[in-house]
Amino acid sequence: MAKGFYISKTLGILGILLGVAAVCTIIALSVVYAQEKNRNAENSAIAPTLPGSTSATTSTTNPAIDESKPWNQYRLPKTLIPDSYQVTLRPYLTPNEQGLYIFKGSSTVRFTCNETTNVIIIHSKKLNYTNKGNHRVALRALGDTPAPNIDTTELVERTEYLVVHLQGSLVKGHQYEMDSEFQGELADDLAGFYRSEYMEGGNKKVVATTQMQAADARKSFPCFDEPAMKASFNITLIHPNNLTALSNMLPKDSRTLQEDPSWNVTEFHPTPKMSTYLLAYIVSEFKYVEAVSPNRVQIRIWARPSAIDEGHGDYALQVTGPILNFFAQHYNTAYPLEKSDQIALPDFNAGAMENWGLVTYRESALVFDPQSSSISNKERVVTVIAHELAHQWFGNLVTVDWWNDLWLNEGFASYVEFLGADYAEPTWNLKDLIVLNDVYRVMAVDALASSHPLSSPANEVNTPAQISELFDSITYSKGASVLRMLSSFLTEDLFKKGLSSYLHTFQYSNTIYLDLWEHLQQAVDSQTAIKLPASVSTIMDRWILQMGFPVITVNTSTGEIYQEHFLLDPTSKPTRPSDFNYLWIVPIPYLKNGKEDHYWLETEKNQSAEFQTSSNEWLLLNINVTGYYQVNYDENNWRKIQNQLQTDLSVIPVINRAQIIHDSFNLASAGKLSITLPLSNTLFLASETEYMPWEAALSSLNYFKLMFDRSEVYGPMKRYLKKQVTPLFAYFKIKTNNWLDRPPTLMEQYNEINAISTACSSGLEECRDLVVGLYSQWMNNSDNNPIHPNLRSTVYCNAIAFGGEEEWNFAWEQFRKATLVNEADKLRSALACSNEVWILNRYLSYTLNPDYIRKQDATSTIVSIANNVVGQTLVWDFVRSNWKKLFEDYGGGSFSFANLIQGVTRRFSSEFELQQLEQFKEDNSATGFGSGTRALEQALEKTKANIKWVKENKDVVLKWFTENS
């Protein structure tokens, strides 16, 4: 699944006035899942009463829970192994007499008895069953031995089970089939089998669609809903004959429903063995564009009819074939299915979902309008497609055994998405962006004592809520970062060789991460060119099984080098011990005298002449930031690097110019450097035109903005930024022919946006005139938007910030009329830029009205308001006053409480705010915090670190900005 949530990586770039993601700020992934919610509210909720349901035997369990009973444990017993399912579903896309949208279904599951048992335990959630005889299900044996009679059945809501108690025992090695009929609500909760709605031609349209990951297939039909319980699925959909039915496989048969010719019955080919969370089925009136790949795979891009008619699916179609071919070559394994459908949904909580053969997306992650979409929208489409298609092999064909190794699925896809996207767009240099988008972003979280390892013991991950918490930036971005490091020190060829062997060995089955290490080790052992200081497992377990990362410190006078666990607050203690004592085996590529070399740090400290320099030499470690660690030097080497940057910055690789800024700011935040050193590392920016160093600087300085934009420090800081960005603004003014054209490369186009955003926010009058003039032209002729799509986010935001009610109301009207989701997203974010308190308060009230703001967008909109210094207090008051209602309304649906808590607390830096946060935790302990539980602990830790940092650095920072502005 793509990162959420969560927030598009590239959309974040366009919203710099509100703040580029701070390196020292906790950021959850954008793209978060519909399941990433607290399940307690769901577990206590009663399934909707639906017409035709019949009562059965006991429906609830005794409040006194006997944990020894298998149905009171969250993990399935190993007694039964599913073989296949026959599932028929009929969604009703108009409400019934009670005003509910429902679906009806029937299911037959065939399973083998693996251990003798007298109870059948299968997942079921919010389903009402129609009795078969006296019980919810019917059971029969395949073979001569009859099945035992059913004694009773019960629904255990806490563990989400349908439990069938038998009068006798199932026989080990024998097969059985169990039938059921059921009804469920086709709710708008973005989970399981749900409905999505949109307007077209003034009419409301309803789509029946799915989101099963991580634990919501059970909400659609009774199933063994764990990733290792792979089976073949035979799906049949009954649907109105004017609509199209899709599923993981191609249709096998389509016929008219005999009893009602206005309905069709579409039966699909059986799937290969696969996990329940990868199932998908959709009923809609969407249209498609199609192509056939060179490997004869049918490719279709589905979306709302108007979007397809206007060509908004063409770009996705253009890049899908090349990306599929790239991964087939990269994995040395053919694409496993005959077709690849990708569909853009109006309501979808995650960024996308890798359902096998039927990938679902948010509209903004799949549709692209060349006339209205920006270059960042285009980059988002190609990278998210690459992420999801990478999963078709790594995750779908071979699947982790349990969610504790989710990082292997998502981290791998988050790494190779850059490779696949780079293949589709070779001129964009996308592979470098992983440093900004993943490595540096996740280090902000992983530097906290409350972080967690990539892989957890399986017994620590049991409940749906615990599973949901794993869908975070550690899983995605740290996973990507350490796998990239592994590929780098092995070489890409060896990495691919081991990967191919792994996929061929475990196809259609499940693995743990150690299986990958074993196959990579086999690749290493098959050659002699690459020599490692230890086995792959010995090296990598230190990066997987302990949280955090090291800072590598080198003294260029003595050649001494040592490592230590980097913590943002060096006085804090890790929340869990490490078997490796927080030491790593560290690969260190370095640059000295213009030559690159490589070194392994295998112990806590060492000494080497390789790291000694003469008076006119400087040393640079972690070339191109392939390693997942930060680097510190003696002060003399730092000064040499600064002199080099201000003399001839081109000698230092672009990525390392960004690294110098990023690492030094983080080291200063942790008290390992004087804060003036990283500030001095930004002086060269007056001569810098490349995107990555500027982005690293703005991200780092955004932390200063968050800490000081309510204090006297902010004035001198703005003056310094204005001084530094003025040459960049002038550079792009010339390069773009006075803003009429766009720079030729992706990175330059991104830095043009940085130049305008920073110039406007720091008070450059020429920038203000530019954005106000462009926005006024649009207001005077709303049918003709003169603002280039690349610049719209920053122009909209700044014009609304400089303006008043009239500018805001115009943007709101355009947002309400927007038919392209990318344009709507830009406007929705910009509406939070107002400096009028009453306008922001009104906008805040809109966010919880689904008629104004879709549920999937509520969190990001509220966080956008909180990012605005004027709106931050409003949001905090709103959240505290309404937490219980927020939790009740969104706790089991689309609301990402982790994003919300992180977004509203990122400015907290006073004792008073810490007290408020602690009181908030105490006041709402009974209600709970859902997927925000870990985020709340991180917010408390971060607030304490902020308080300490501000006390220690405020006066020094004020003095430095005053002297240098």
UniProtKB/Swiss-Prot annotation:
Entry-linked CDD domains: M1_APN-Q_like (cd09601)
Provenance organism: Rattus norvegicus (Rat)
Residue ranges with Low complexity bias: 47-64
Protein name per Swiss-Prot or TrEMBL: Aminopeptidase N
EC number: 3.4.11.2
Family membership: Belongs to the peptidase M1 family.
Maturation and modification: Sulfated. N- and O-glycosylated.
One Pfam family of this chain: ERAP1_C
Cofactors: Zn(2+)
Region (Cytosolic Ser/Thr-rich junction): 33-68
Segment forming the signal sequence: none
BP GO annotations: angiogenesis; angiotensin maturation; cell differentiation; metanephric proximal tubule development; peptide catabolic process; protein processing; proteolysis
Lineage: superkingdom: Eukaryota
Cell compartment(s), UniProt: Cell membrane
Bridged cysteine pairs (disulfide): C760-C767, C797-C833
Residues exposed to the Cytoplasmic side: 2-8
Matches recorded under InterPro entries: Aminopeptidase_N-like_N (IPR045357), Aminopeptidase_N-like_N_sf (IPR042097), ERAP1-like_C_dom (IPR024571), M1_APN-typ (IPR034016), Peptidase_M1 (IPR001930), Peptidase_M1_aminopeptidases (IPR050344), Peptidase_M1_dom (IPR014782), Peptidase_M4/M1_CTD_sf (IPR027268)
UniProt keyword terms in alphabetical order: Aminopeptidase, Angiogenesis, Cell membrane, Developmental protein, Differentiation, Disulfide bond, Glycoprotein, Hydrolase, Membrane, Metal-binding, Metalloprotease, Phosphoprotein, Protease, Signal-anchor, Sulfation, Transmembrane, Transmembrane helix, Zinc
Cellular component aspect of the GO annotation: brush border membrane; cytoplasm; endoplasmic reticulum-Golgi intermediate compartment; external side of plasma membrane; extracellular exosome; extracellular space; plasma membrane
Region annotation (Disordered) ranges: 44-68
